[in-house]
Amino acid sequence: MYCLPVFIILLLLISSAPSTPPQPRNKDRVHLISLLDNHKQILQRDWNSCCGKNPGCCPWGK
């Protein structure tokens, strides 16, 4: 007899819980890819400035 009110309260709580629409998986992957591309561009810029001043610090040996 005590279970019925608890069950009804749980049903009301579940139905009133906020629901978020599912996000597509590709959106997260696109952000990750753009983050990695930005990281590569920053490293390339740093290497270019280093190679202009000191060719010995270049990773490709210019």
From Swiss-Prot:
PTM text: Contains 2 disulfide bonds that can be either 'C1-C3, C2-C4' or 'C1-C4, C2-C3', since these disulfide connectivities have been observed for conotoxins with cysteine framework V (for examples, see AC P0DQQ7 and AC P81755).
Coiled coil (UniProt feature): none
UniProt-annotated location(s): Secreted
InterPro entries: T-conotoxin
Cleaved propeptide residues: 20-48
Tissues where this protein is expressed: Expressed by the venom duct.
One GO CC term, this protein: extracellular region
Modified residues (Tryptophan amide): W60
Molecular function terms, GO-annotated: toxin activity
Major location (coarse): secreted
Signal peptide extent: 1-19
Keywords noted in UniProt: Amidation, Disulfide bond, Secreted, Signal, Toxin
Top-level taxon: Eukaryota
Homology family: Belongs to the conotoxin T superfamily.
Domain remark text: The cysteine framework is V (CC-CC).
Name of protein: Conotoxin Im5.1
Species assigned in the record: Conus imperialis
Taxonomic placement: Eukaryota, Metazoa, Spiralia, Lophotrochozoa, Mollusca
